[in-house]
Amino acid sequence: MLFRSILIDASTNEIKLMANDMELGIETRVEGEIAERGVIALDAKIFSEIVRKLPDSDVTIETDASFKTVISCEKAKFNIVGKSGDDFSYLPYIEKNDAIVISQFTLKEVIRQTIFSIADNDNNKLMTGELFEINENELKVVSLDGHRISIRNIELKNNYENKKVVVPGKTLQEISKIVPGGVDDDVLIYLTDNHIVFEFDTTTVVSRLIEGEYFRIDQMLSSAYETKVIVNKKELLDCIDRATLLVKEGDKKPIIMNITDESMELKINSFIGSMNEDIDIEKEGKDILIGFNPKFFIDALRVIDEENVSLYMVNPKAPCFIKDDEGKFIYLILPVNFNNAAN
């Protein structure tokens, strides 16, 4: 659970639920009847688990002067201890100007298609977030972890002032969980020097940004290539997925691609066994023998919605690019040494 406490604020004519850890804050308004106004802070994990397992019916929450709380729904009744909301940190006031408008579906998809390649440790804080770069009517979202780069380019409905911010990965993961994802419903995004604000339906999310200048990746995005391969995405994904059956978690065994005219042979060797499989391809340019971390390829292929994908390679020590002709997405994956695994 991300938050320790949830504040239920029924001190006015509406019911608001809030959670805030000083880095990320969420506030949502819910419909209901207020019999007596008040505020209570409840343990976030316990409260959310109770609500999740209650019947799909109206919930009644009652508290007394000592913050003992009764949560009831149909025949179920829970008694838990709350606390005063006096020390609760409300969401900070953010001056909001020039909202960036994007559909809920698009935002959710962009996060899904990039979040897997952020770093999962804090050794480099910038790698734990994603770059949101506004350039007139385009939004570029970038994530990287030192071994791969994911880029999604989105065309916006309007032009905006150019701006770059780094949004924490945990913020985007939470957004992805709570945004309904409707195609016809929008999210309003506000950017300041220190915060990003997401507004959708009856919910507001405020997050601190990660400080620092994001990595300059343009020099890595060369369009030159020696080998281009067009392959059915599902066939390639399924083949690599099968190969990983022979790799224990934690093993660093590469998937080796031997690309020749009209055929890609994929093979893997591990202590468990070996596997090889041929896939039909369209090839342009030179033959190449190259190895990759199979998980990195699987992660990228799983979020691509195209029937066929294009792979661009230069040599066995240079990155592979998976990208479309329209420039909507680019996935860069660094190769690995496979000398010990090729036999």
Residue spans of the language-model regions?
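Structural preference for solvent-exposed beta-strand-turn elements
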Residues: 1-343
